[in-house]
């Protein structure tokens, strides 16, 4: 984040003009920007693949995001990177129509204040994430 403080970064996600966060990544190790959005209580539209599923799916196995469908295929030969991206690696290729549908659904949920949606539940889920990351949980391991 360069020279930005945690508070400055958080303020970007909480800016009044920001209604949601979208990531159509092929794959993420952890997905820090996605996590920061969840932690900040804004709805997320994302490819349902890779590391971000560790926190985008709650402890009961329910998705807490607008899940964009994808096709899982090998990476393109031109992006092979020795020691990082091997030719056998697989990437999620988001489906365009699914992305459009999930963006529209998120937009409609946000603008209608749909409390029964991922958008309507984003602040509550952020609270759960905060609780899971409190100092006691860090000291003693995950609470299940």
What are these regions (language model features)?
Residues 37:
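Donor-sugar nucleotide-binding helix/loop cap in glycosyltransferases
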Residues 1-16, 50:
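Conserved active-site histidine-acidic residue motif and adjacent donor-binding/catalytic loop
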């Amino acid at each position: 984040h360069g020279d930005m403080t945690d508070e400055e970064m958080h303020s970007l996600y909480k800016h009044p003009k920001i209604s949601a966060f979208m990531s159509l990544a092929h794959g993420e190790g952890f997905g820090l920007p996605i996590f920061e959005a969840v932690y900040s209580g804004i709805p997320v539209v994302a490819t349902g693949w890779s590391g971000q599923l560790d926190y985008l799916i709650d402890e009961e196995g329910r998705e807490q995001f607008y899940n964009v469908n994808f096709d899982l295929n090998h990476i393109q030969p031109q992006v092979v990177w020795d020691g990082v991206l091997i030719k056998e690696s697989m990437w999620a290729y988001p489906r365009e129509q699914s992305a459009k549908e999930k963006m529209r659904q998120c937009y409609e949920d946000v603008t209608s204040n749909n409390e029964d949606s991922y958008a309507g539940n984003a602040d509550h889920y952020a609270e759960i994430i905060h609780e899971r990351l409190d100092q006691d949980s860090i000291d003693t391991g995950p609470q299940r």
